[in-house]
Amino acid sequence: MAASSLNLLLILSLLTFISLQRSESLSDNPSLTLLPDGFDWPISHSDEFDIIDGEESFEVTEEDDGVTDRRSLYWRRTKYYISYGALSANRVPCPPRSGRSYYTHNCFRARGPVHPYSRGCSSITRCRR
């Protein structure tokens, strides 16, 4: 019994030694490149192609480290679905020109416009309300 456990221990140590040697030899091969944990991609969406003096800047400063956690929620994929009730024929989701959003829950019971127009005159609106 002692001889069989000694043989088992010897075989396990030999297999461990061979696997360690094999994993080290893979990293020496110049055709294989090991990727780091994170890619150096731009963190923010708005300034990902900022060009300063002809060079693209993709550097993240220490000040931005607290912001990256907040912005990471932006990069998650979300799926939006339209309900079968909204797709049904001959159904107007909300009265036209009511100022209510199509996404307002039960917009026929809601009173008053959601976002009333309160901007002043400009050359675009030509003071029309």
Curated annotation (Swiss-Prot):
KW Oxidoreductase (keyword) present: no
Positions bearing the site annotation: Required for proteolytic cleavage: R70, R71
Arranged from A to Z, the UniProt key words for this protein are: Disulfide bond, Hormone, Secreted, Signal
Q: What does this protein do?
A: Cell signaling peptide that may regulate plant stress, growth, and development. Mediates a rapid alkalinization of extracellular space by mediating a transient increase in the cytoplasmic Ca(2+) concentration leading to a calcium-dependent signaling events through a cell surface receptor and a concomitant activation of some intracellular mitogen-activated protein kinases.
Question: Keyword Manganese on this protein?
Answer: no
Q: What is this protein called?
A: Protein RALF-like 34
Q: What induces it?
A: Accumulates during senescence.
Quote the PTM field: Proteolytically cleaved, probably by S1P, a subtilisin-like serine protease (subtilase).
The GO terms describing molecular function are: hormone activity
Cite the propeptide residues by number.
24-76
Using the record, list the residue span of the signal peptide; answer none if the entry has no such feature: 1-23
Q: Which cysteines are joined by disulfide bonds?
A: C94-C107, C121-C127
Q: Which GO terms describe its cellular component?
A: apoplast
Domain of life, per lineage: Eukaryota
Gene behind this protein? RALFL34
Q: Which family does it belong to?
A: Belongs to the plant rapid alkalinization factor (RALF) family.
Sorted alphabetically, the Gene Ontology BP terms of this entry are: calcium-mediated signaling; cell-cell signaling; regulation of growth
Indicate the principal place this protein occupies in or around the cell. Answer: secreted
Tissue and organ distribution: Expressed in roots, stems and leaves.
Q: Where in the cell is it found?
A: Secreted
Kindly give the Pfam families that the UniProt entry links to this protein. RALF (PF05498)
